[in-house]
């Protein structure tokens, strides 16, 4: 991983010059097109135009624009094709006439590659206040007191631009501050152990994970390293992770982990598994099995994230704060096994009227996972549930200590399922309740059983519940409790 001296000005590695950034696709000649004519139309003008076009192409001149007879609107076929791009596939064929082909899109792959190369060249040649490398900082630390002192900031640390053939683990260990090129695609073929603080900026680059290991990135306990201001723990931002052939966990964090603007596409296992402090902000999870798993005694902050078509978005076994997120078409957006704070989220259920077929056995009983599932716990309090919008969702409420009091939540077309002991512990005076339905479980029918997969990884037998509609028993009487009371507005900052 030879790296040029950052003090030397010039073109970075991988670029022969600024002119080489221009894509070579512009020099390629686009296939000529001729006007589609009905059979039998052998006019002299058409033959002359075809002969003239072939002579001009043979002479190396620019191909002449083919002529055509005017249509009913007074315009020829070429003008119609220019005004209506959707007709180009019918009005244009290849020069050899072997079949219909559509016109290339306005933005091709070559133009996208050229834009990415221009962006990479601009980022790599930009002037920054970088004055010292991570190795020099380690050499300057003679004793343990120097290791604890934060003499430099992340802005002063020299950036290493990772090439597709470089070793991720070695680059993180040696340079700590690593950047990825947006015009390159990276591949992880083995486990990456991270044992020091690092700052990885992806710049929108794609990283494909293709390894048979159980974990792709293991963030282990951090050793004694020099302190750099702004680089606390493992920080990864603006990276797109894909793994069509990977069946393990992407991130296994045993130390502080910050994921900022990271995207996960199509992982059939856990994306982030945290055993300690983790902050996930501005990330996107598309078609993943499990998004964020917070293990016991962990503290997680998940905010401004997007969960789309995930089987299980968030699994909370520790202390979690989930705020300002959006979920769409997820089997279960959040499974709460411990304490949690759920505020300012927008959750849209499945467009199709089908329930999730996955179970949870967290409290010793098997229940179908709902969009937001609060499992029973004899010693835990209810989660804080405020300012959330639920549309076409289902909410499962187990038995807990205290009273579940959702505050200013919109439960639009939402079904609430109450376990037998939790009906008297739910207060719905502060929600928008016109289209909600509340069901209470009376008993479980042991004669009607189904074997379903569970979120723990196994399969269990579930007894079919016998339920009763208790919507009107728990819905507040709005003729007595007016909507102008303090539950829907106050004199503080929440005033309308």
Curated annotation (Swiss-Prot):
The name this protein goes by in its record: E1B 55 kDa protein
Outcome recorded upon mutating residue 444 to A: Decreased ability to promote ubiquitination and degradation of host MRE11, without affecting ability to promote ubiquitination and degradation of host TP53
Keyword Ligase: no
Quaternary structure, from the entry: Interacts with host PML-4 and PML-5; this interaction promotes efficient subnuclear targeting of E1B-55K to PML nuclear bodies. Interacts with E4-ORF3 protein. Interacts with E4-ORF6 protein.
Subcellular location: Host nucleus; Host cytoplasm
Family: Belongs to the adenoviridae E1B 55 kDa protein family.
Chain positions found as Phosphothreonine: 495
Function: Plays a major role to prevent cellular inhibition of viral genome replication. Assembles an SCF-like E3 ubiquitin ligase complex based on the cellular proteins ELOB, ELOC, CUL5 and RBX1, in cooperation with viral E4orf6. This viral RING-type ligase ubiquitinates cellular substrates and targets them to proteasomal degradation: TP53/p53, LIG4, MRE11-RAD50-NBS1 (MRN) complex, ITGA3, DAXX and BLM. E1B-55K probably acts as the substrate-specific adapter of the SCF-like E3 ubiquitin ligase complex.
GO cellular component terms attached to this protein's record: host cell cytoplasm; host cell nucleus
Domain notes: Contains a PML interaction motif that allows the subnuclear PML localization.
Post-translational modification: Phosphorylation at the C-terminus affects the subcellular location.
Bridged cysteine pairs (disulfide): none
């Amino acid at each position: 991983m030879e790296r040029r001296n950052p003090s030397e000005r010039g073109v970075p590695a991988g670029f022969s010059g600024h002119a080489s950034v221009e894509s070579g696709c512009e020099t390629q000649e686009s296939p000529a097109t001729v006007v589609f004519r009905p059979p039998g139309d052998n006019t002299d003008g058409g033959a002359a135009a075809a002969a003239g076009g072939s002579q001009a192409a043979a002479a190396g001149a620019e191909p002449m624009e083919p002529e055509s007879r005017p249509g009913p609107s007074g315009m020829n076929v070429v003008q119609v094709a220019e005004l209506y791009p959707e007709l180009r596939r019918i009005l244009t064929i290849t020069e050899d006439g072997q079949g219909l082909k559509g016109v290339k899109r306005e933005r091709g792959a070559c133009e996208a590659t050229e834009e990415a190369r221009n962006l990479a060249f601009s980022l790599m040649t930009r002037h920054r206040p970088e004055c010292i490398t991570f190795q020099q900082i380690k050499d300057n630390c003679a004793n343990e007191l120097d290791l604890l002192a934060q003499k430099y900031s992340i802005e002063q640390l020299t950036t290493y631009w990772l090439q597709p053939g470089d070793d991720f683990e070695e680059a993180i260990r040696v340079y700590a501050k690593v950047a990825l090129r947006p015009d390159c695609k990276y591949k992880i073929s083995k486990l990456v152990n991270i044992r020091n603080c690092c700052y990885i900026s992806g710049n929108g680059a794609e990283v494909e994970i293709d390894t048979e290991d159980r974990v792709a990135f293991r963030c282990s306990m951090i050793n004694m390293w020099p302190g750099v201001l702004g680089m606390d723990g493992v920080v990864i931002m603006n990276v797109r992770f894909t793994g069509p052939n990977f069946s393990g966990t992407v991130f296994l964090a045993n130390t502080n982990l910050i994921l900022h603007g990271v995207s996960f596409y199509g992982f059939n296992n856990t994306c982030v598994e945290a055993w300690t402090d983790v902050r996930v902000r501005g990330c996107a999870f598309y078609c993943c099995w499990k998004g964020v798993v917070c293990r016991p005694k962990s503290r997680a902050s998940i905010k401004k994230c997007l969960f789309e078509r995930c089987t299980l978005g968030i699994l909370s076994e520790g202390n979690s704060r989930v705020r300002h997120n959006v979920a769409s078409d997820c089997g279960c957006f959040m499974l709460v096994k411990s304490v949690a704070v759920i505020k300012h989220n927008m959750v849209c259920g499945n467009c199709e009227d089908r329930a999730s077929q996955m179970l949870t056995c967290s409290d010793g009983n098997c229940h179908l996972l709902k969009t937001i599932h609060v499992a029973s716990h004899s010693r835990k309090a209810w989660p804080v549930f405020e300012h959330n919008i639920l549309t076409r969702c289902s909410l499962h409420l187990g038995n807990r200590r205290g009273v579940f009091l959702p505050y200013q939540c919109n439960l639009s077309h939402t079904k609430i399922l109450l376990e037998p002991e939790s009906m008297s512990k739910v207060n719905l005076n502060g929600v928008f309740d016109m289209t909600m339905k509340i069901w209470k479980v009376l008993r479980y029918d042991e004669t009607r059983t189904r074997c379903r997969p569970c979120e723990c990884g196994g399969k269990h037998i579930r007894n079919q519940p016998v339920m009763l509609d208790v919507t009107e028993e728990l819905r507040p009487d709005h003729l007595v409790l007016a909507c102008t009371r303090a539950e829907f507005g106050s004199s503080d900052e929440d005033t309308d």
